[in-house]
Amino acid sequence: MARPPVVARTLPALRRALGDLRRRNASVALVPTMGALHDGHLSLVRLAKRRATKVVVSVFVNPTQFAPHEDFGSYPRTWKADASKLAAEGVDLIWNPDVKTMYPEGFATRIEVDGPAVAGLEDRFRPHFFGGVATVVGKLFLQVRPDVAIFGSKDFQQLRVVTRMAGDLDTGVKVIGAPTIRERDGLAMSSRNVYLTPEERQVAPTLYRAMKETAKQLRAGKSADASLSVGAKMITAAGFSLDYFEARHADTLAPIHSLKAGPIRLLVAAKLGKTRLIDNVAV
């Protein structure tokens, strides 16, 4: 039977626990999360176990990536269920700090990332977001000092931002993107899916179907503008309010206009009722 994970809530406790792991010459993988864990998160843990001998999962709802009008206060917090799931997966250490531990009084430092963070996608609608993400992930990398860190590809722009930050700051952390995990009907798993009404939940998979159809059109040789128009019409006809639906270079997130531009990623964000969903697919 697997040993239950150590739970650290203070920096001294985290350092002691990490010291115990490192004394065994362990390689360490970090899986940063905000809790409300689902099978998508657990797939990251399983990948982490394949990439390192010890796995640390952080559970922290990061206030600096939420704007005042967003859902920080109502974001699902399910600590007991999360801890049980992580124990069942054989996680070695859970880092569960509070806000005062991560951002003590007088905290005044922020990491800002250009390039993919200002690609005109999420940053247009959530200009605060990537500075908050880069700052908290930078702190987690310094606190845990992992060899590898696992992030889901559903938040594709975030993955690119974190990868750039990790490289630019010489963290020594290898950032690995894991495949998006989907429900049987194609909806990308997300902690925010719980906000959907039963009726909206039936409509939500249209987002993925529209992206697949757009990718099909692109592969058939149609222009990016024409292909995206087809997908956008599918999305809005289903009742979504579209924030963006774009074809970008998969590595740089630069706008593209043909398949010859390099590897392509379709990225979308749209609101269904009060719930904002994001997703992406490779072409």
Swiss-Prot record:
It is found in: Cytoplasm. Beta-alanine binds at residue 65. It holds the Pfam family Pantoate_ligase. SUPFAM superfamilies: Nucleotidylyl transferase (SSF52374). One of its GO terms (molecular function) is pantoate-beta-alanine ligase activity. The active site is at 41 (proton donor). Pathway: Cofactor biosynthesis; (R)-pantothenate biosynthesis; (R)-pantothenate from (R)-pantoate and beta-alanine: step 1/1. InterPro entries: Pantoate_ligase, Pantoate_ligase_C, Rossmann-like_a/b/a_fold. (R)-pantoate binds at residues 65, 158. GO terms for biological process: pantothenate biosynthetic process. It catalyses: (R)-pantoate + beta-alanine + ATP = (R)-pantothenate + AMP + diphosphate + H(+). Homodimer. This is Pantothenate synthetase. The lineage of its organism: Bacteria, Pseudomonadati, Pseudomonadota, Alphaproteobacteria, Hyphomicrobiales. The gene is panC.
